[in-house]
Swiss-Prot record:
<keyword id="KW-1003">Cell membrane</keyword>
<feature type="transmembrane region" description="Helical; Name=7">
    <location>
        <begin position="175"/>
        <end position="195"/>
    </location>
</feature>
<dbReference type="InterPro" id="IPR000276">
    <property type="entry name" value="GPCR_Rhodpsn"/>
</dbReference>
<feature type="topological domain" description="Cytoplasmic">
    <location>
        <begin position="31"/>
        <end position="35"/>
    </location>
</feature>
<protein>
    <recommendedName>
        <fullName>P2Y purinoceptor 13</fullName>
    </recommendedName>
</protein>
<feature type="topological domain" description="Extracellular">
    <location>
        <begin position="148"/>
        <end position="174"/>
    </location>
</feature>
<feature type="disulfide bond">
    <location>
        <begin position="7"/>
        <end position="85"/>
    </location>
</feature>
<feature type="transmembrane region" description="Helical; Name=4">
    <location>
        <begin position="36"/>
        <end position="56"/>
    </location>
</feature>
<feature type="transmembrane region" description="Helical; Name=6">
    <location>
        <begin position="127"/>
        <end position="147"/>
    </location>
</feature>
<comment type="function">
    <text>Receptor for ADP. Coupled to G(i)-proteins. May play a role in hematopoiesis and the immune system.</text>
</comment>
<keyword id="KW-1015">Disulfide bond</keyword>
<dbReference type="Pfam" id="PF00001">
    <property type="entry name" value="7tm_1"/>
</dbReference>
<keyword id="KW-1133">Transmembrane helix</keyword>
<feature type="topological domain" description="Cytoplasmic">
    <location>
        <begin position="107"/>
        <end position="126"/>
    </location>
</feature>
<keyword id="KW-0472">Membrane</keyword>
<keyword id="KW-0675">Receptor</keyword>
<feature type="topological domain" description="Cytoplasmic">
    <location>
        <begin position="196"/>
        <end position="245"/>
    </location>
</feature>
């Protein structure tokens, strides 16, 4: 029964949230791109209302395409059928599952290509800026690089390995000529990279820390650092005043 629950509900929710995360990362990358390349244009895209509307639309879209995958897994669960989630689906369920799979693959590869384009352009812009500054402010340049590239790092660490593995794995499942040993190896690779995709939940806070100032200011450890830094500055200014006096 637990395995049937995984097939009908939890795995569907997992994949739904994974692709929501992929799309949102793509939008964050697009936001970084606009801020660096066109900082004074497209002001309406930066408004909170617009961001909330897009977020609600994305979650609603993935919910409605995922819901039939839960409903159409309606065959009786037996010890043999739950070994493969597709066995719980009828012909309509299998067809819808394939449609959703194709949509998901299209979304990932679209975001993948766009992210490459965005960050190639951003990297060139950052490099040109770094060269013009003649390394006078190396510390700030390093901070900027960290902030700019954290999104693409999370994307490639969490999501790219799974989708690179999923292509040959899916082919091996649909091709009867594939060697059984190779199928098992690809299955292990797919499950391992799927674990990496699940670690995205741990990587998301890095994006908030690097890119969201309001979030960082609310962290107790960061507030402590800020207090220490400000007290050190006050002590330094007091010392300077005493010395000058």
């Amino acid at each position: 029964q637990l395995r049937a629950f995984v097939c009908r509900l939890s795995s569907v929710i997992f994949y739904e949230t994974m692709y929501v995360g992929i799309v949102l990362l793509g939008l964050i990358a697009f936001d970084r791109f606009l801020k660096i390349i066109r900082p004074l244009r497209n002001i309406f895209l930066k408004k909170t209302v617009f961001a909330k509307t897009v977020s609600v639309f994305i979650w609603s879209f993935f919910f409605f395409i995922s819901l039939p995958n839960m409903i159409l897994s309606n065959k009786e669960a037996t010890p043999s059928s739950v070994k493969k989630c597709a066995s719980l689906k009828g012909p309509l369920g299998l067809k819808w599952h394939q449609i959703v799979n194709n949509i998901s693959q299209f979304i990932f590869w679209t975001v993948f290509v766009l992210m490459l384009v965005f960050y190639v352009v951003i990297a060139k812009k950052v490099y040109d800026s770094y060269r013009k500054s003649k390394s006078k402010d190396r510390k700030n340049n390093k901070k900027l690089e960290g902030k700019v590239f954290v999104v693409v790092a999370v994307f490639f660490v969490c999501f790219a390995p799974f989708h690179f593995t999923r292509v040959p794995y899916t082919y091996s499942q649909t091709n009867n000529k594939t060697d059984c040993r190779l199928q098992n190896q690809l299955f292990i690779a797919k499950e391992t990279t799927l674990f990496l995709a699940a670690t995205n939940i741990c990587m998301d806070p890095l994006i908030y820390i690097f890119l969201c100032k309001k979030f960082t200011e609310k962290l107790p450890c960061m507030r402590g650092r800020k207090t220490i830094a400000s007290s050190q500055e006050n002590q330094s200014s007091q010392t300077d005043n005493i010395t000058l006096g």
